[in-house]
């Protein structure tokens, strides 16, 4: 079984000729070099696994190898959206407009994305120089495709958090990195929003075409490439994008190897990665406890639910198991159970909800969107749809789709934040008044970036560089 290992082109591996299984289960080395470590398919697989290790935010937790996905992918978006809060005072992400370029969590979101991108660039560059005969069948292109997906994911994260994603004409796009960073090329300006979308979609086109048709659900395949492309096109929302989202998600739902879990709760409490609904998940290391501690540290809630969260789950059966008592407080219990250490990057439920949103936004039949929404809600234990059936207004149905997206996919991969900031500003402020204005649906570029890369360009509007 492959395990996440940070190799890439950054790690000097001891005993490169050892068994592949041993390599993939080894801890990262300490010596970092820019060396040619991809020599054949075997070493390419190890290097690719290093990119997945970065994707999972692998590291060391009190001496135990652990995946630390939750911090940036679950907790930060939950704070930004206003559904959870820190129990001991407050943190800047709870008051969006008070964030600064020196915020630690903002820096983690930024640097984590570039770690994925840089590791992916190393694989893409190195593997291109290896003879095709060193690979079995189409595996060379498949590895490049998986690395392209991971690079696209990193750039997508930066686009949704740090760029004016909603304006194709904006200069406030992503600092795109398509080459492995060295001292000679670290100085680079950020690109436009249009160029950012073009770069991400180019990588996803390659991934969709060449990624494996089948792969364990902790690795990328063609269906996962289609899923991320649907996310990106929904965020862009230009002419024809919603129709493409409908086509992509229909293809995944009707032809892909996934099924909605009969009972949503079973994914988190019993099945984990064994669920056929999980398109892409994060496999934990043996003996790690990091994800449990992210929500129930020392048997007390690490984060509390907010009033907004309480209202969201009012009269919803999920409120009985996704939230609950932890010690003396009302905390987040969604993950607590037999599969507590597993995290989720993409589930089939999201494809249903993206399709429903795209139908409404493209002027399609509200009844079609409602049917998709009912399917998802039914698997979550909802049996009465009187209020949903009564909705006749397109904007109201969009908001209902948003609320189901938040209820179902909250604290997984920032889906609740991405869905919120696609709404009109008045709706955004209804959910999270602390955002105040449009500038604050975007985060500040970390101050450290302006020191390392002074040619990057302007800070995002509403923030200072330090």
Predicted feature locations:
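Short, surface-exposed recognition loops and adjoining beta-strand edges that mediate ligand/DNA contacts
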Residues: 34-35, 62-82, 163-171, 175, ...
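Hydrophobic-face positions in mid-chain alpha helices that act as interaction patches
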Residues: 46, 65-66, 242-349, 382-388, ...
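Acidic, glycine-rich segments characteristic of secretory precursors and extracytoplasmic regions
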Residues: 4, 20-71, 453-466
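Inward-facing hydrophobic residues that define packing positions of alpha-helical scaffold repeats
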Residues: 117-120, 197, 204, 242, ...
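Short coil/linker segments at helix-helix boundaries
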Residues: 138, 161-198
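Conserved, well-structured interaction surfaces
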Residues: 86-162, 204-215, 338-348, 358-365, ...
